[in-house]
Amino acid sequence: RNKYKQIENIGVVCVIYKLKKGVSKHFWVNINDERFELPGLIEFSNLRKIENDLKIIYLPYYMPITHEKFEKNDEYFFEETFNYLQMLNPNLEKEDVIDFSVNKLKYAQPICDVGFKEKIPPIQTDIEDLYIADTCFYYPEDRGVSESIKLAKTIIEKIVI
């Protein structure tokens, strides 16, 4: 438990839209524009089609959970992000919004500072046959599906063998 407390994480506010219209033809769009407080957007429906040709868009705000913006309400995030979406697709209107949600996660990603490797706790806990799968185990890689699969295989091998 103490080893986990040593690992500092960054939080994320995940804003998700279900829309009638998309904003891009791309799955992943990095944004390097000072008018946007986002690193980018992910339009999942450009990777995999959704029923009725609906569009699913994910907008992440990575920040420390102590940042004042982390405490803002859903309406604040709707207004700000919808403005961003309209900058990308001026034809988008509020009537195109089918659904919208804001989700906040305190432990989105570990902050890998100097000496991080030594902070990583063992996968096996003190409780027999209880293993923990955490993104800190991906180090030195970043979060990703392939890293999740690799960690799952490692744990399965420990359980089965």
Locate each region found by the language model.
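Mid-domain catalytic core of redox enzymes
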Residues: 1-71, 75, 80-92, 122-123
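A short coil-to-beta-strand element that immediately follows conserved catalytic motifs
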Residues: 12, 91-105
